[in-house]
Amino acid sequence: MKPVQLFIGGSPSPWGLAGLSPQGSPAGFLASTSNATLVWPSEELPSGALEIAFDGVQAGADLDGIECAEFISTPDGLESSDSLIDHVVLMTDNLYRTCEAVTEVTGCPLKRVREVGEIRQGFHRVGEGGVILEVVERADVSRTSLWGLVIATPSFDDLVQAAGDLVSEPKDAVQPGRRISTVKAKAGLGIPVALMTP
């Protein structure tokens, strides 16, 4: 069982653009990556909603104002894509307060802090090879929230080419040797998403 589940509002149909193939189940539509499961619940969330659940963490646990969702059972044999969730972005007005909450709830310590101008970023990894929780402190943020996610895929070039003007022109990522492309809002994914090379 993948240790992180992301619950997404709106329709799963446009997510083929990101290299995912959501499959129907009693719980809703599911798409499995190598390190996480994405869920479009049968009791549909509003478009733009993003929730997170962790294996072993009780539903309702307080992640500095973010309420953790219930971790659900997924069917055996769920086909997994060769993509992975590189990181999930949490926005906050106080980096260390939020990072302390992440550590307390998940048991995953703060690995490092990066400062870029007035923006500070803290990084936690959920399990070996797992999802990175990137906590971003910005002056214009008033409360902690889940913002969006980045999907790393070996099919990056093919997906970007197929998506055409639904994604931005690829550019160099912060990590040396990697490239990133942002999925535009008109693609209909409902939440901020970027694609990245592995």
Listing of model-derived features with the role each one plays in the protein:
Residues 1-110, 125-198:
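Glyoxalase I/VOC metalloenzyme domain signal
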Residues 118:
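Phosphate-end processing signature that detects enzymes handling 5′-triphosphorylated RNA
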Residues 122:
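Aromatic/basic-lined ligand-recognition segments
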